[in-house]
Amino acid sequence: MTSKMLEEALSSHLAASNQLQHLDPALLEVAGRLRRQPPQVAMTVARGSSDHAASYFAYLTMQQVGIPVASLPMSVVTMQQAPLRVSGQAVFAFSQSGQSPDLVNSVRLLRKRGALSVAMVNAENSPLEAASEFFLPLHAGAEQSVAATKSFIATLSASA
């Protein structure tokens, strides 16, 4: 007997394949914008396993693009209302569901302050997608296990 998590991990290659077939137009749009208006700094906002995937994204971005990337504590934006100067910078949000209010509110506030916002979300038509300027769907399919296994692997794939 295999667990749901193992089943989803074993099927994650389908999500990566699906991304290769569908993600290019959205990636090209984001890449074009970043080339026209390159940020000096990028931020990530995420929770749980998505935050771990965001760390991988940050590592790749720093190594390949050369701009610093920091994980932003969402409470600094939402609860403490810190006057962050983010105009012209980029924020990348990562989520399986795109439903977390603190994640959505962080992106909404950072975008209002002038940050380019990109959401990598598995669930389409989510509040996080609506709050972001750009949306990169993960195409992982429905999640059955608690750990969002396919979405985690799909985020790693989309980040690369």
Which residues fall in each region the model found?
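Cofactor-/ligand-binding subdomain signature composed of acidic, glycine-rich
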Residues: 1-38, 147, 153-157
